[in-house]
């Protein structure tokens, strides 16, 4: 997914810096989004509840909480970093990667 496609779906403007995307709270809840850009960094929380997304990119960094309820995600990517809480209720995720970092509750 390109930066422009993500902006169109989320109806926001993203600041691009060194190939990563930075922004505060990124609310994609209930959208038709199916993928996220590689190496995405979200400064605040990332809300993907009820989306069509099936996987997360490697090296995803979320400064706040990550909400995945109602998604089709079955596993978490390598090097996932979540500064806040990670909400997995209502997903098909059955195991966690060894290198997962979560600053809040799980």
Predicted regions and their residues:
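Extreme N-terminal leader/activation tails
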Residues: 1-13
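A detector of tandem-repeat and repeat-rich interaction/domain scaffolds
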Residues: 11-106
């Amino acid at each position: 997914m390109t930066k422009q496609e993500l902006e169109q779906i989320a109806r926001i403007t993203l600041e691009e810096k060194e190939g990563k995307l930075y922004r505060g709270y990124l609310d994609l809840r209930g959208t038709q989004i199916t993928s996220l850009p590689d190496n995405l960094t979200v400064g605040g929380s990332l809300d993907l509840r009820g989306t069509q997304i099936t996987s997360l990119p490697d090296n995803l960094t979320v400064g706040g909480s990550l909400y995945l309820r109602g998604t089709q995600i079955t596993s978490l990517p390598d090097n996932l970093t979540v500064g806040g809480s990670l909400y997995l209720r209502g997903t098909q995720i059955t195991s966690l990667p060894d290198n997962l970092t979560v600053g809040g509750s799980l």
